[in-house]
């Protein structure tokens, strides 16, 4: 058993509490000075980035407002950093103070320990006197240690509360910064989407305008070509009515639906026999200019049929053939303006008529007046043959 049977356990208890306060020198917050310097430098740069007198207007005001928000954000971060440094420094000082108090109490007990040991050597009453001596010193030392620990606990609670406040403020700043960033990103995305939509709208409008111009150009080109075609047919005598049916083709481009009879409504006008004689004017004397019209041929045949048959059957046939030859020759001369052309032939003379009459009065075609004559083929001119069969 140790002679300092009260002081030694007390010193051991103080050593244990001292070990709970940590090993080494407490950090005074110097690790946060680097971040504080960064914030201060950022504040200086932001302060220098404000627009000067040479930049005015809404853009400058908007930029200045954004820059001011950044300055306020970094300023609040710097203040939080300073408060956190102060809090850490205060807590480190509290721990160091407690350590110093415990160290002093331990040293005080170690100082009186030899006296307590010497008192134990007194006969009979030595241990009692030593115990009476050690007890007050140990009690006083433990009271001081308890006070130091209480101070440390209270200081730690205060600093912990302040730390929670700082963390709440930091979270608020970060949330505001994130909201600002998200707002900026949302504005950027909104602007990009607006520009993309405007580009698509302009592109569609441009395509519509291009389509309208293209269809207008094609329609105008077709209209001009059709007008030129109508002008060409209008300048040709006898074909002015031929374009009435073809003009229906334009309805294929302007009508909502197609009709099978829209373009064929006037097709009969092209095949009409009344319009065929008008073709004599095509080419000014070439082509069909020498041929008589159907109406003229019909009128000539009618007049020939009404003539008296004084010369007999053969004479009538010959006279009919001669009349038709004269009619064809006359029509050819009138259509061509003279002997030029396919139908331009001289009128047959009286001598040729007499010769033809004599030709059919003699030979195999001849017969008695009361008898039935055989069929006679007579050349009407122009390669036409007339078969005459008369019964008296």
From Swiss-Prot:
Source domain of life:
Bacteria
Q: Which UniProt keywords apply?
A: Disulfide bond, Secreted, Virulence
Where is this protein chiefly located? secreted
Q: Where is this region: Disordered?
A: 302-392
List localization entries: Secreted
Question: Quaternary state and partners of this protein?
Answer: Homodimer; disulfide-linked.
Put simply, this protein is called ESX-1 secretion-associated protein EspA
Q: Give the lineage.
A: Bacteria, Bacillati, Actinomycetota, Actinomycetes, Mycobacteriales
């Amino acid at each position: 058993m140790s002679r300092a049977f009260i002081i030694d356990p007390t010193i051991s208890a103080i050593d244990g509490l001292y070990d709970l306060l940590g090993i080494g020198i407490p950090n005074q917050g110097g690790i946060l000075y680097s971040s504080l310097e960064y914030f201060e430098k950022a504040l200086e740069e932001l302060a220098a980035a404000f627009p000067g007198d040479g930049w005015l207007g809404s853009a400058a005001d908007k930029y200045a407002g954004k820059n001011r928000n950044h300055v306020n954000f970094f300023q609040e971060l710097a203040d939080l950093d300073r408060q956190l440094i102060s809090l850490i420094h205060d807590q480190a000082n509290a721990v160091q103070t407690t350590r110093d108090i415990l160290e002093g109490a331990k040293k005080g007990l170690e100082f009186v320990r030899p006296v307590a040991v010497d008192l134990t050597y007194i006969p009979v009453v030595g241990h009692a006197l030593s115990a009476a001596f050690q007890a007050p010193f140990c009690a006083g030392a433990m009271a001081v240690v308890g006070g130091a620990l209480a101070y440390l606990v209270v200081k730690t609670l205060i600093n912990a509360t302040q730390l929670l406040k700082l963390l709440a403020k930091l979270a608020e700043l970060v949330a505001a910064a994130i909201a600002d960033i998200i707002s900026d990103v949302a504005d950027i995305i909104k602007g990009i989407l607006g520009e993309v939509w405007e580009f698509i709208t302009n592109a569609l409008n441009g395509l519509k305008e291009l389509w309208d111009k293209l269809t207008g150009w094609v329609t105008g080109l077709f209209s001009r070509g059709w007008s030129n075609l109508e002008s060409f047919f209008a300048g040709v005598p006898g074909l002015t009515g031929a374009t009435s049916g073809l003009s229906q083709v334009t309805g294929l481009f302007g009508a909502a639906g197609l009709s099978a009879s829209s373009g064929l409504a006037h097709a009969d006008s092209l095949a009409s026999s009344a319009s065929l004689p008008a073709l004599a004017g095509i080419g000014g004397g070439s082509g069909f200019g020498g041929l008589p019209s159907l109406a003229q041929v019909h009128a000539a045949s009618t007049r020939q049929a009404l003539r008296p048959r004084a010369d007999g059957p053969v004479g009538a046939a010959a006279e009919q053939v001669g009349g038709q030859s004269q009619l064809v020759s006359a029509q050819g001369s009138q259509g061509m303006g003279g002997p030029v052309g396919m139908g331009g032939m001289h009128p047959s003379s009286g001598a040729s008529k007499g010769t033809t009459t004599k030709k059919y009065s003699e030979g195999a075609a001849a017969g008695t007046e009361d008898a039935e004559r055989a069929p006679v083929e007579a050349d009407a001119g122009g390669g036409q043959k007339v078969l005459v069969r008369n019964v008296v």
